[in-house]
Amino acid sequence: MSLSNEPIQRIAPSVKLGKNVRIFGFTNLYGCEIGDDVKIGTFVEIQKGSKIGHRCKVSSHTFICEGVTLEDDVFIGHNVVFTNDRFPRATTNGQLQTEADWACVPTLVKRGASIGSGAVLLCGITIGEEAMIGAGSVVTKDVPAGATVAGNPARILTKKP
């Protein structure tokens, strides 16, 4: 593992780190698994239960919440946000919700996919192998392998035959 000289890197003991992982400053990692040869930029949070495959790049200001799996060779651009709750609420009956009131909905990003900067991925979807998500897209449903999508909501622009 290689840590930059930048201050404040919070890496909890529960994190499983692979070989040759590069982590830059102002990161917050806990309860996640990080594969070999991964680069994690500044101001990134990766929550418990998330899995990052080998040779992935997670660019700065990205939020990877519980339930997200990135397979090998995935690129995540700057300021990408994943979600894991279909109906987020602080309260439903006037009482602050607890973790018991919440169910994590997982998201899978398959091998070689690329997520453009500023994209938001809603939970419960699969991004297919080698798919490309355009910058600023809001992805609300599955993206087929090899497809390029963009927009809000994201729509298929091209598909590999």
What are these regions (language model features)?
Residues 138, 153-156:
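Conserved switch/coupling elements of ABC/ABC-like ATPase nucleotide-binding domains
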Residues 2-13, 25-125, 152-153, 160-161:
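Flexible, glycine/small-residue-enriched loop-and-beta-strand segment within the central core
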Residues 125-142, 146-148:
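C-terminal/domain-terminus segments
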